[in-house]
């Protein structure tokens, strides 16, 4: 442990160090540049999460590190661990894995819901080997691919009496992989696996049974990415990358002095197989001495948690939680005003763009600030965010975190850089920094991922304004993001073309005010086929393992747009589904209106949906406010031109 834990020159000491000339509060890019005058090795000295847990235990000792609501209800009997007890559980888990013979270059995979054992296990595994959290909803073949690629020799899951389907899935994974893998279960002991709690009791909790000298650049974890419903890419995380990213967020957030005046309780209800929950919610909480409140096994998927959420905030004085746009929209359907939630002052949002009207309504009704950020598995977690003491530009995703850089560029068809984008010019986003992963585990995933050494091609589109704020405008890649749930269109397309009557298929995202996007598909059929769209939708439900990926609409068409070299050209389909959506929206408001819809491609702002109406003034005034209210919920630029009869042309736009 580092004695600098007692040094007053450290902010969140000893994780973030202060130097002469540092700004008191980080407000803008100039402040970031001032911080960057000192080397990152001096600014963020701690090298590994394993070291950080020891340092935090020494500093915070008997303060609560983590609490658990087993059912995600406000009246649950709380289970709690102090910082010292938290460290002991992580040490015990590491010793358990060591006793099962794991090697340092092997991994422990976790097929679990959100529960304390997963947190202890993840960081215990990183002390002795590598941790690999896996989405329990993935299909068996995808999980088999992950555990094979990551050299998983221990798989932790729930016992058959606790969750029969999850245990059967884990058993199927074990039987369908060629290498030896030990199954460890949590719950009632069973014959087919080693029992977690029985073996844990045999381990010492005050020392490691192994001698491993960790360095910051060693692999700490493998996180799968690229969509929960397609072939997952595996990102290699390092110990140093995790520590740096957590510290990057701490230094642009509220100061330790300000946090000490709050209740310091961070609620976590996002899935622990995702970097947001592990790094943004959990690791930063432990580094700043907060209490991590784990809100039930299913997190935000649990309807009981959603209905009880504001009671939980009130009872436990929660001051921070992170969510996705669909979560925030659902929480506003609950009665907020009848609860005292003054403790809540800071919320995080990522995964997909959040409608501005939703941000404003949430802040107005709760008094809490939503901090929109941008990041991905490949940046460990966070790449840009709104600084706590900086100005808010609602609709942007803030500014870059320190010691990391983001560029907007134009790329050619081979993924090579053509030019740097000007201010307010849309381009593909590239990211470089110490929090960016060194590589994907699979060779195929690294192809065209790095246009320049160290610079990751995110596949996202965005622009920077004159103040350095980043504005996302779309995605170069074709992932469909449904309520923060990444859907690879290829899995939909492959399923559809597996039908004997389907020739070609293309899946795209349809705008949705609640989920952001919903998957839809366009298909062409064989000559003479009489297959209906409803039959194809049922076919997808039968063969796509993740329900969220099943298309909500299927459009049967005579042909699909193609590029000159014979590839399906999706841009016209993306435009078509937007036009269909807006047309349905307008007709639902007034089916007698005369209008036209066009998609305008603008290099500086991205696509603009242009709607032109020819109507009487009475009809125009009747529909204008309703239409604006509905369009403002969506995350695309729009422009409505109303041409009233016998009146001047008027314009309404976002």
UniProtKB/Swiss-Prot annotation:
Reactions catalysed according to its record: ATP + a marinolic acid + CoA = AMP + diphosphate + a marinoloyl-CoA; ATP + a pseudomonic acid + CoA = AMP + diphosphate + a pseudomonoyl-CoA; marinolate C + ATP + CoA = marinoloyl-CoA C + AMP + diphosphate; pseudomonate C + ATP + CoA = pseudomonoyl-CoA C + AMP + diphosphate
Domain of life assignment: Bacteria
GO biological process: antibiotic biosynthetic process
Keyword terms of this UniProt record: Antibiotic biosynthesis, ATP-binding, Ligase, Nucleotide-binding, Plasmid
InterPro entries, A to Z: AMP-bd_C, AMP-bd_C_sf, AMP-binding_CS, AMP-dep_synth/lig_dom, ANL_N_sf, ATP-dep_AMP-bd_enzyme
SUPFAM superfamilies found in the cross-reference section: Acetyl-CoA synthetase-like
Pfam families named among the record's database cross-references: AMP-binding, AMP-binding_C
The keyword Chaperone is assigned to this record: no
Known pathway: Antibiotic biosynthesis
UniProt EC number: 6.2.1.60
Disruption phenotype annotation: The deletion mutant can produce both marinolic acid and acyl pyrrothines, but not thiomarinol.
Coiled coil residues, start to end: none
Record GO terms (molecular function): acid-thiol ligase activity; ATP binding
PANTHER family: LONG-CHAIN-FATTY-ACID--COA LIGASE, NONRIBOSOMAL PEPTIDE SYNTHASE PES1 (EUROFUNG)-RELATED
Function: Acyl-CoA ligase that catalyzes the CoA acylation of pseudomonate C, leading to the formation of pseudomonoyl-CoA C (PAC-CoA). Also shows high activity with pseudomonoyl-CoA A as substrate. In addition, can activate acetic, octanoic, 2,4-dodecadienoic and 2,4-decadienoic acids, although with much lower activity. In vivo, is probably involved in the biosynthesis of thiomarinol, a naturally occurring double-headed antibiotic.
Family indicated by similarity: Belongs to the ATP-dependent AMP-binding enzyme family.
The name this protein goes by in its record: Marinolic acid--CoA ligase
Gene behind the chain: tmlU
């Amino acid at each position: 442990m580092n004695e600098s834990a007692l040094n007053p020159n450290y902010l969140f000491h000893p994780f973030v160090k202060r130097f002469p000339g540092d700004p008191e509060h980080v407000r803008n890019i100039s402040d970031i540049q001032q911080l960057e005058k000192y080397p990152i090795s001096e600014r963020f000295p701690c090298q590994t999460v394993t070291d950080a847990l020891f340092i935090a235990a020494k500093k915070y000792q008997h303060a609560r590190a983590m609490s658990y609501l087993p059912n995600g209800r406000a009246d649950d009997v709380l289970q709690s661990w102090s910082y010292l007890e938290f460290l002991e559980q992580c040490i015990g888990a590491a010793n358990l894995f060591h006793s099962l013979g794991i090697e340092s270059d092997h991994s422990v995979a976790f097929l679990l819901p959100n529960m304390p054992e997963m947190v202890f296990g993840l960081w215990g595994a990183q002390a002795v080997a590598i941790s690999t959290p896996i989405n329990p909803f993935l299909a068996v073949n995808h999980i088999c691919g992950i555990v094979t690629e990551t050299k998983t020799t221990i798989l932790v899951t729930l016992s058959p009496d606790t969750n029969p389907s999850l245990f059967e899935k884990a058993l199927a994974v074990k039987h369908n992989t060629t290498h030896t893998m030990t199954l460890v279960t949590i719950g009632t002991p069973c014959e087919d696996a080693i029992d977690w709690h029985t073996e844990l009791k045999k381990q010492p909790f005050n020392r490691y049974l192994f001698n491993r000298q960790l360095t910051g650049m060693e692999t700490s974890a493998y996180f799968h990415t690229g969509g929960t419903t397609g072939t997952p890419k595996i990102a290699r995380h390092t110990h140093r990358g995790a520590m740096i990213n957590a510290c990057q967020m701490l230094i642009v957030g509220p100061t330790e002095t300000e946090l000490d005046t709050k209740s310091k309780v961070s609620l976590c209800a996002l899935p622990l197989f995702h970097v947001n929950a592990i790094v943004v919610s959990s690791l930063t909480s432990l580094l700043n001495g907060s209490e991590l409140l784990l809100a039930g096994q299913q997190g935000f998927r649990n309807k009981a948690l959603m209905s009880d959420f504001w009671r939980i905030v009130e009872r436990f004085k929660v001051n921070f939680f992170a969510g996705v746009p669909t979560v925030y929209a659902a929480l506003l359907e609950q009665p907020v005003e009848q609860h005292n939630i003054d403790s809540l002052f800071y919320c995080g949002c990522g995964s997909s763009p959040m409608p501005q009207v939703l941000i404003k309504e949430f802040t107005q009704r709760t008094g809490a600030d939503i901090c929109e950020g941008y990041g991905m598995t490949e940046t460990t977690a966070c790449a840009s965010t709104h600084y706590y003491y900086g100005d808010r530009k609602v609709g942007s995703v803030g500014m870059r975190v320190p010691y990391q850089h983001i560029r907007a560029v134009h790329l050619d068809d081979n993924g090579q850089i053509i030019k740097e984008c000007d201010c307010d010019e849309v381009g593909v986003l590239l990211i470089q920094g110490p929090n960016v992963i060194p590589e994907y585990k699979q060779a195929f995933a690294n192809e065209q991922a790095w246009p320049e050494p160290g610079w990751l091609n995110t596949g996202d589109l965005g622009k920077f304004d004159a103040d350095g704020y980043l504005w996302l405008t779309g995605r170069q890649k074709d992932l469909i993001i449904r309520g923060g749930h990444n859907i690879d269109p290829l899995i939909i397309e492959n399923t559809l073309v597996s039908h004997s009557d389907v020739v070609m298929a293309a899946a795209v995202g349809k705008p949705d005010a609640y989920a952001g996007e919903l998957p839809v598909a366009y298909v062409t059929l064989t000559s003479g086929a009489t297959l209906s769209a409803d039959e194809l939708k049922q076919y997808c439900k039968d063969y796509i393992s993740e329900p969220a990926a099943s298309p909500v609409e299927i459009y049967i068409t005579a042909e699909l747009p193609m590029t000159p070299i014979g590839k399906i050209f999706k841009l016209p389909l993306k435009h078509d589904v937007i036009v269909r959506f807006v047309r349905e929206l307008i007709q639902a408001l007034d089916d007698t209106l005369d209008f036209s819809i066009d998609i305008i491609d603008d290099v500086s702002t991205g696509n603009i949906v242009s709607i032109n109406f020819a109507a009487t003034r009475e009809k125009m005034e009747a529909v204008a406010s309703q239409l604006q209210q509905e369009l403002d919920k969506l995350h695309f630029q729009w422009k409505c031109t109303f041409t009233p009869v016998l009146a001047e042309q008027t314009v309404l736009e976002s």
